[in-house]
């Protein structure tokens, strides 16, 4: 249920400065999606604006922009960055850690999707409706303390989000806990200097140590290019998987 204005203000005052910065970022992104959808931005994160026949066309402009952005950018981004196909997890229970306001893991057809983010309720209040995603389980919780029983998920994913958490090692422990024995883990990780919204400086050693209990979890692809961004060394995008 979306927060009332008073609830939003009360909750907002309790957020950390990092969380407030993230909300400001996503509010600005929504305005960019609308500009892109209307053709006032010819490209956004390498993705050309849609032709009229490629637009979603629901009555609410911002919702139509979000759905079109999800279809043309977010879902292809997940498949590209994770190097997976849309039927990879059919029939499986999938957790997306740090899903953000758009549940991009819906790109995996036939999967039971859980979208975990500590700001989930706030996203609704700044314009990101859940209504177009009735089959997604939205969970407002920190990755360091997940509200799931042990061995609950067949698959755990994270795409350019694990560097946003406050406690990386505790997050890794929680991911390992909720993943079924022999379950699948895939993370697309950005190695970069710390920023306000992305305070963690990760590297192979730290990731490998934190996930040492997940058998076979290892880097399988490195690049200075993701579906969204290009970076310069020493920054890089690293895909980690155990399958």
Predicted regions mapped to residue ranges:
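Conserved class I S-adenosyl-L-methionine
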Residues: 185-214
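A short SAM/SAH-binding and catalytic strip from SAM-dependent methyltransferases
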Residues: 155-166
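A short glycine-rich, Lys/Arg-flanked "PGG" loop and its adjoining helix->strand segment in the class I
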Residues: 169-184
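Core SAM-dependent methyltransferase catalytic element
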Residues: 221-243
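Class I SAM-dependent methyltransferase SAM/SAH-binding core
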Residues: 95-145
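Phosphate-coordination loops involved in phosphoryl transfer and adenosine-cofactor binding
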Residues: 91
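A short acidic, Gly/Pro-enriched loop at the edge of an enzyme's catalytic core
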Residues: 141-156
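Class I SAM-dependent methyltransferase Rossmann-like catalytic core
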Residues: 5-88
């Amino acid at each position: 249920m979306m927060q009332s204005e008073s609830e939003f203000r009360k909750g907002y005052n309790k957020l950390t400065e990092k969380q407030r910065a993230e909300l400001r970022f996503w509010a600005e992104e929504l305005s960019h999606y609308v500009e892109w959808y209307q053709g006032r931005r010819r490209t956004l994160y390498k993705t050309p604006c849609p032709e009229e026949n490629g637009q979603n066309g629901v009555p609410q402009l911002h919702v139509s922009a979000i759905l079109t952005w999800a279809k043309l950018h977010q879902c292809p981004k997940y498949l590209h960055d994770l190097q997976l196909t849309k039927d990879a997890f059919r029939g499986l229970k999938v957790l997306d850690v740090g899903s953000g306001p758009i549940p991009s893991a819906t790109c995996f057809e036939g999967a039971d999707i859980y979208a975990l983010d500590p700001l989930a309720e706030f996203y609704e209040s700044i314009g990101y409706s859940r209504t177009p995603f009735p089959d997604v389980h939205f969970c407002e919780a920190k990755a360091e303390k997940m509200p799931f029983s042990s061995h609950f998920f067949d698959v755990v994913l994270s795409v350019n989000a694990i560097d946003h958490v406050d406690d990386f090692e505790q997050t890794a422990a929680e991911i390992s806990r909720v993943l079924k024995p022999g379950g699948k883990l895939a993370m697309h990780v950005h190695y970069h200097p710390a920023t306000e919204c992305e305070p963690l400086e990760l590297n192979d050693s730290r990731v490998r140590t934190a996930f040492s209990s997940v058998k076979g979890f290892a880097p399988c692809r490195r690049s200075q290019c993701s579906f969204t961004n290009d970076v310069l060394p020493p920054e890089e995008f690293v895909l980690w998987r155990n399958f």
